[in-house]
Amino acid sequence: MSDDGHLPPKSSVKRWLVTTNHKDIGILYTATAIFTLVLAGIFGLLIRVQMWESGAFILSDIGYNQVVSAHGLLMVFWFLSPFAFGVANYFVPLQIGADDLAFPRVNALSYWLYFFSIIIFAVSFFQEATFSGGWTMYAPLNVPTVDASSVASVGGFAAVLALVVFTASVTLGSVNFLTTIYRMRAKGLRSRDMPLFSISILLTVWMMLFAFAALLAALLVLSSEHLLATEYFASEEAGGGLLWTHLWWFFGHPEVYIVFFPALGVIAEIVQTFSGRRLVGRKWFIIAMALVAIQSFIVWMHHMFLTSINLPIKTVMMVTTIGISLPFDLMVFALIYTMIKGRIRWKTPFLFALGAILIFIVGGITGVFLGAIVLDYSFRGTYWVTAHFHYAMASAAVGIIGGIYYWYPKMTGKMYNEFLGKVHFVSAFIGFNLLYFPMFVAWETPRRWFHYDAGFTIWHQMATVGAFLFAASFLVMFYNLFMSLYSDRVVDDSPWAYTESTEWTVSSPPPEGNFPGTPSFASGRLEFLGADGGEAQTDGGMADATDAVEQHADHASWWPFMIGFSALWTMIGISGLPTSYSVWPILFALPVFVGALGIIGARRDGFGPIHGLYLGAAMPLLSAFLLVFHAHHGIVSGFVEASNYFYITLFGAVFGAVSFVGYGYESFSVPEPDFAEQWPFKDVKNTKLGMWVFLASDIVLFGALIGAYGFMRINYGWTDWWADASVHMAVWPGLLNTYILLASSFTVVLAMAYARRGSRRGTLGFLGLTFAGASIFLMNKGYEWYEHYIHQGWVFNTDPMASTYYLTTGLHAAHVVVGMLLVLFIIARASKGAYWSEGESADTIEYYGLYWHFVDIVWLFLFPLFYIL
């Protein structure tokens, strides 16, 4: 990174470590996803070799389970969606007329969390044994109290933690895309007028925001079973196994559409371009997509027809499942009719789009069988499901591959080899169908098992041949795209005869700042406006990033990489921590965070009394934690006997604490767009909208945990549950904490009010009171936990009530700690004139207040649940 914060050249490795430019991040996502595809594909080939004949062939029983699990997890999580969002990162800002995503550093952080989550998963293979519980991770088969084999090994837990990091990446990306699309569209570009790919991404990130929050809740509970020995999924009397299935499939079925929707948008763009006409029934196509996005959250129980759910509920889910196919019928017919009405150009992108439609039709039709209760009883757990699932999911991959060919000229300025592109399509299409269609014939083969009836051998051998042909087809693609980079087939702005979207109006590849001026559709056609509001002089799309709005597209930051790197070490360490050491690395990192606020803050703003206070407080705080550690483990013996995983976690947590402070203090300006289409959030700034969206995800997270509490209590017996726990629960600690948090919400409001009045004393005073209130809350909660855990012996796994109490209130306490760390940062900045002095804005305190009010509101639900009802 140069001294002025600009990016190094693309030939430099450093460029790709520090970039925040959306096009660079898109390339990183795409390249990493392709690497994951290769890795998962190798696992897939191992599966097919094992299935060449019935019985053990090249893999042991546990080895086969590990390969099947890794293949599924890598494909579903680390390939399909990131592959699509590599394309989305690159082209959504270009399509909507934005110079970048709303939060460029958050975009980079999202990528690095994704990247390092893959590394965590890869490392799990070298930690005793990796996860082997299947990609659906069904509990209670994967919790230590039930299965102490490789499913519950250190490596198995590391795979779970890798998914936690991946989910964090997805959440950040969802917040970023929603804020960008709602706040940074070109003037005059209404939401419904956006290109269909961008509309599909908008609907996808809404689904991701809520679905992945439910998955995160499930993963946090599963992690607590490994790390803290809680008793959720292992509890038979509280219906723990069924609870996992609900949480998983509430995420899992929307995930099918999360994967397919970006491909659907790509397919629509390609069909329009190569049919030479606008999509027939475009309005209804968009409405149908929106209906599917909504309906996706009310069909999850069709995956649970074999469970003990009563028949009326199953019947309702059968109806909703069949009903969700109707909007897809409309969309498929719209695509087909567009092709009929247009004049088709049989180029490689169109072939892949057409292939994706055909594959999806097969996947959709065969899925209807599984939506019928009676048929599901026969097909569930067989290779019919395997074939259906791959037809549904692979249609997304095939569609996005078509998008790679479609936009390759725009990204590189070079045209791919058309002949090799068609060779790739033909070999891939034949190989795919040869691989998966025989599975419908051999449908009685049980899933996740390599023993089968000898009569199915020919079909499995046919599938194995198809697998190798399908894999070989990608070698053609890789060769074609790589060699085309060095060809002389240079393209202009648009190599296609019919294109409507904005990305085709700039040079290939696009410049750093994307556009030669500010894009606007206000006149009814695309114009690039200069700083004076007049039409800009275009020069093929080249423009220097000279004004404030364009500068951040060329900005660099090390901190997203650093935070992702810290997550790598922290999660690898946590995977091997015993329960007795689980909390200490995080506690020891807190004084480091406070000390870093003093040191980095002094360098950034100049040394002041507040920085001295933070530096002075860090050592006593660390000493206090060491004294408590000594009481539990012994100050010498505790560190001597600690495993390597303890020190790995400690390194990651400390490195992360410093990285977060550096991220917060970095001078990185992203100006608010002042000439954009922003309905319905015109008067809501980017950061405020981003906070709202993030809190919407957090609502689902806590809602899932509260729902888990209710589900388990109803199954356990509502009154029996409280009878077992009432001897441990006193009302007054919870009531006191309720008053404390409500008062702290009031002090945040007063701090914001005084900041807007320009009062330094009032701002700092009420921010300090907010911190004090949070501290008292935690001390009271800590005392309460100490009484329960040490004096009463009511530990994490005493009963289901104890597990739900400690985990749910513990997650809330973690939110309180985050709020305290944030307010310490705000106090440090405010002490040097930020937020309240002339020319400063109090908006940061307002945004912090939104978060803090949410934390308080959550407690208003937890208090009656755990102390009164």
Would you name each region that the model predicts?
Residues 691, 695, 734, 805-809, ...:
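Short alpha-helical catalytic segment bearing the HExxH-like zincin motif
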Residues 75, 802-821:
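Short alpha-helical packing/oligomerization segments
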Residues 758-765, 823, 827-857:
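Interfacial loop-to-transmembrane junctions
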Residues 348, 758-764, 797, 801:
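Membrane-helix interface segments
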Residues 731:
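An acidic/histidine-cluster motif and surrounding catalytic segment
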Residues 2-726, 783, 787-789, 794-797, ...:
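Membrane-embedded and interfacial regions of multi-pass energy-transducing membrane proteins
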Residues 860-869:
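Juxtamembrane boundary at the C-terminal end of a transmembrane helix
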Residues 246, 686-692, 735-738, 746-754, ...:
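Polytopic transmembrane helical bundles with strong interfacial aromatic enrichment
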